[in-house]
Amino acid sequence: MSESATANANRETLGFQAEVKQLLQLMIHSLYSNKEIFLRELVSNASDACDKLRFEALNNSALYGDDSELKIRIAFDKDARTITISDNGIGLSRDEAVEHLGTIAKSGTKEFFSALTGDQAKDAHLIGQFGVGFYSSFIIADKVTVVSRRAGVEANQAVCWESGGEGDYTVEMVEKATRGTDVTLHLREGEDEFLGGWKLKSIIRKYSDHITLPIVMKKEDWKDGEQVMTEEDETVNQANALWVRSKSDITEEQYKEFYKHVAHDFEDPLAWTHARVEGKQEYTQLLYIPARAPFDLWDRNARHGIKLYVRRVFIMDDAEQLMPLYMRFVRGVVDSSDLPLNVSREILQQSKDIDGIRSGCTRKVLGMLEDLAENDKEKYAKFWEAFGSVLKEGVGEDHANKEKIAGLIRFSSTHNDTAEQNVSLADYIGRMKEGQEKIYFVTADTFNAAKNSPHLEIFRKKGIEVLLLSDRVDEWVVGHLTEFDGKHLQSVAKGGLDLGKLEDEAEKQEAEKAADDYKELLEKVKTSLGDKVKDVRVTYRLTDSPSCLVSDEHDPSGNLARLMKAAGQPMPNSKPILEINPQHPAVMRLKYEESRFDDWAALLFEQATLAEGGQLDDPAGFVKRINDLMMALSAK
């Protein structure tokens, strides 16, 4: 960050972090059509500042001084063309002002910028999701002044931060008589519509009615045919916690606006659940499922979305103990009646009360998803597209709810042969052929690799459905989900082919006869390939391909081995089994090949490796072999 002192020894001019400059430009252009959200964002920040003071004051009540009545004040000045949002919350020190207002100290910043598309509507959603907060001021202001004094410091230790939203800003130490923060917006030309009490109040009631603190403005009265400001305060919002109100008193619009506040999202939520739990533990939960995935969904260390309150006192923002990791997409509020007010993250980790709340919240979200899956398939398909891969993690992480989660999972399959994941395990079982005892699946690193796997040939021939698994997490799923509803899950690429009652006796006998006829060839191929394979055997799972690779029943699949290797994880050194199709012309030819036997054997192994999505140790050698064999064949 560049830094140069100005003539005023107390004032410094600092350069914005590069990402802030980029965000400001994006935001001013992408969000202009929705510019009134600046007030929602600044009120939300003011509310958070008061929550933080309340929390710190639990251990140090002196922070309140003689001002314990927390509130947010909004004022406007038509002559100066300014709007000021004030709070008496925790306030900012000089260093905090530089850190929070001059930089984006957020994980996922890089991912956020790489996700931007240039499409104004899509980028507006992403920017909102990233949390523009304070920077939304610049949508309507060409200069923003922030004066703040942190709770517990002297009046002369306040800070003034000021910027025109271009490349830099200034900070200087100033005097401020009271604790808290004043954000003053100097409006751009053409934004005078916001310099009126009615307009500001309507925005507050639309977006911030649920804020638990009073939002006050000076009352206006009619005098001589115009609105005149009085000295009397009026509270503009309802100023009580939305989640403690009766469900029948809350409109759908109010639920949606509260979600946007709590999740810092611009879009409406997909679904929500609101319940008061009584009995051994008492708490209220208001939990939302967003409509879209955040850009940092795959960061398992990213902030979680549940705010914890104790008896309506804010405790913490991202209480990860309240929701399992595989539900990190859930947003909302939990308000406990039983936890101590001085609860810390360490206490949360060891609290049986928290375990109970977590279990209750998890069951509630799973119930909401089951209801969507049953009664609103279109919404559930939206949910699955956004969060399905994350929900799959729960199969291995949440033993108590494993069956419920398994019932909610959706897969692609050979039933419709499209990449859309819309087949449940119950759907699959409902379509099983008479006599079929297992749920068959294949794993691969892409949908097309799964769909075109040679392992499917016999299944397609017999009309047996196979699940096509190509999400990275799918290997984890099938590693932990070995059966569903009494049916064993079986990889079509592991172990010997066992179709149970679906086997054709004549085919089986033919395969056994071929194994005898090809015994000598199998030994010869195994010797030629050396330590590349564990074994070579005849198969009848292939109808069109000459060969395929399978893993032993208890070895990791080839796809899992590749995933682990790519992640730098150690894997046991297991070798594949090469299976050959005795009906294929290439295999028949090999039986009588002498001069180029090793090349043909290597080719069978290499094309089987490629067909299952593997990589060759020596691609150049493979190409040379192909070319040599093509030349040899064309010369005949």
From Swiss-Prot:
Subcellular location: Cytoplasm
Keyword Ribonucleoprotein belongs to the record: no
One GO CC term on file: cytoplasm
Keywords in alphabetical order: ATP-binding, Chaperone, Cytoplasm, Nucleotide-binding, Stress response
Disulfide bonds: none
C: annotated segments: 563-636
Key word RNA-binding present: no
Coiled-coil region(s): none
Region (B): 346-562
One function term, GO molecular function aspect: unfolded protein binding
Span list, region A: 1-345
NCBIfam families: PRK05218.1 (NF003555)
Subunit structure as annotated in this protein's UniProt entry: Homodimer.
Function: Molecular chaperone. Has ATPase activity.
Family of the protein in this entry: Belongs to the heat shock protein 90 family.
Record protein name field: Chaperone protein HtpG
Provenance organism: Dechloromonas aromatica (strain RCB)
